[in-house]
Amino acid sequence: MYSVLFRQAEESSQLAGAKGMNLIKLTKHGLPVPDGFIIQTNALARFMEDNQLQETSENVEGGIISGTFSDELKDELTSSFYKLRESYRSVAVRSSSASEDLEGASFAGQYETYLNIKTEEEFLAKVKECWASFFSGRVSSYKKKMNNQIAEPLMGIVVQGLIDSEMSGVIFSRNPVTHDDRELLISASYGLGEAVVSGNVTPDTFIVNKSSFEIQKEIGAKEIYMESAAEGIAEKETSEDMRSRFCLTDEQVIELAEITKKTEDLYGYPVDIEFGIADHQIYLLQARPITTIDQDKKAAEEKRSFMITDTDMNDFWLNMESNIEGPVSPLFSSFIVPALEYGLKKSMQKFPIGVVVDEVKLYRGHIYSKNQGGQQPPSEDCGKELFPILSEHMYDIINHTYLPFYRTLDQLAQTEHTAESALEAFQKLKAFYLTAYEEHFNIVFPQILLTNKLQAMYQDIQGESENAHFYEMLTGKMNKSLETDRCLWLFSVEVQENPNLLAIFENNKPEQLQEKLEQTDEGRHFLKNVHEFLQEYGWRSVKSHDLIEQIWVENPYFALANIQNYVRNGYHFDNEFQKTKEKREKLYNEFLESIEDPGLRTEFDRYYQWTLNSANIKDDHHFYIDAMLDAKARIFLLKIGELLAENGVIQDREDLWFLYDDEVEQALLHPVSLQEKAEKRRQIFHEYELAQAPAYLGTPTKEQLKAAEEIVGAVIEDEKNTENHIFGIAASSGIATGPVKIIRDANEFSQFAPGDVLVCKMTTPLWTSLFQDAKAIITDTGGILSHAAIIAREYGIPAVLGTRTATERLRDGDIITVDGSSGKITVVSRS
């Protein structure tokens, strides 16, 4: 017998191949598998015998393709094919080697899969192609690499009814990104599953807690989908509506999770599953061991002292995402995690702010702090001697600590290093990060104490805890972010006054501007001025905290795109800034006059003037410390990357970001190739970028959650949310109605149009250029003192922040009303 139905076949990889054996197991245990049959491994042996072929024959692949079926073999196979076709419009033909999908050798993508097979001729041809794939060069090479020695060609074939999947994807019963046994991960998109499996689409991602079935989800672009055509498979573009919504409902995700748990229980080890959904029915198309997870975990995600362990998960850890966006690269984590912990602990001893940070660690590439509540509130006089001079205090530290070190870094970036000098400079940089973040918090914490003091006075006088108006009384104060914007606006004024420059900016895309400007004398002079501007204001990157992204100094594209935006929208910076300043003065004078007690009025005014004088600290310290330190470090570290690339440690200097500090130090003195490790970590880093990290870990008390929200904003979704109402933190007052535009990163800035409501995870100073066009601002993370809140108040537009779910629940084109005074978002109509 050469062919046998799934439900009748023996669970033997030697007869059915590994893929076939798994489908037989699933079918016999009642899991939802489309009907099919196995062409057993003895069929290939018979075919080779009939055609006088041996495994050692020259061009055995070609011999199989040109070979002929004996009548006996052909009749049996085609009879099974026609019986299956009675129930299905077409079939899928897949290779099923005895070696494939077994532990230690997944052979993923090494063999063949053919979809939408309808005729006998196609069927027999694809059977031969599957057999031939066993002898292909790429498979032989892979088997050699995996130390897989097969004595005889044990290649079976799976023939399965083709499900015309409306949605499909892959499930990992153990999270392959974090290796967390408590979670499963689903990648899904529209149409047939080949688009997801082959990596041709950016799928939706669902992470499911296997106990509580709590779902975290990240929407993917889902650029295309595949479907059965008259012949073969057709690839089509997804519609805007399809892209903007999740392809699976929560109910479907939970049902998939339940089936996955049953499958995992059946095997007794982690599995991955390919699935399809048609007519509301879930089908399992394949299941196999997750063969590389332990090796990947060992090779690519070594547990370091600053990574959260399983034991750590018993404590309460707060995601620091409102301050540090997204996952951080391995090298940057080596610098920033120890620096944050050191700086927080040292500074909190001097300036207690009501919370204690015990540790700072990494989870899924994201930075978390272990917070401890219950600290004694600061004394009345804590930091008071600095209150009148906070801004001056900051600039004294910047001038005496940071700027001299930056000049040293600039020199080091121009130096041709030996391994020894590079190592010495690298270690100096690591040590400076500790100093830098101690001083960072020495600047920030006294300002927090002062602002909290003034806010408490304000609330005592008002008799309420409404915050938006309080912070609007602190707007209209120039800072480095606004100063940068004003310089860019002045460039736009120059463009508008010069017809030749104006033509370039009006008629070209942002990425074309530099090339066009370089073609004329006026353009070259303009670029020269832009480059001079960048030497002062360009020490910032697309990603606010990391070394991994280009900085403005390296590429004038970012500045030119911002200038073009000002040219396009006709925004007048000075006029708008003056309006904000006048609004602030009016608000404050009205409030001050409402205080009847002269002594209280005088005391409030004194604290207010101190607070207003220090209102630039949030952005100025970011400009000189957070952004500039990482930018200067990047330029220097690229020299280290060049040295390692020359010595064969890595292929490209920017692979450096995917090594840890100790590996860099060892490789400088004892070069060995770390390229494979760097590539694996780069892949994992990008997976972290796509996944949604939890807002917190552990099981916090209500008091811990409350304390956390006072620091970073909302950490859980508001329980008042309904289908058409979302609540968040009221961060900038006013009401506005407009269409939603979800922006996920800087690459999408050009899609934002004047009058849109900006919806995003969070903002950094790079995003400031969008505020001049925005009707309102909505974020998933952040609180009343976040960048988005401060800049929204400066631009006088409503902002609701810390919604946790806005980027998931809203879609491009939805018409919404944003009430920045109450923190309420209302969906007026769906797109």
Swiss-Prot record:
InterPro entries: ATP_grasp_subdomain_1, PEP-util_enz_mobile_dom, PEP_Utilizing_Enz, Phosphohistidine_dom_sf, PPDK_AMP/ATP-bd. Keywords: Transferase. The keyword Transmembrane does not apply. The active site is at residue 787. It comes from the Bacteria. GO terms for molecular function: ATP binding; kinase activity. Belongs to the PEP-utilizing enzyme family. This is Uncharacterized phosphotransferase YvkC. It comes from Bacillus subtilis (strain 168). The gene is yvkC.
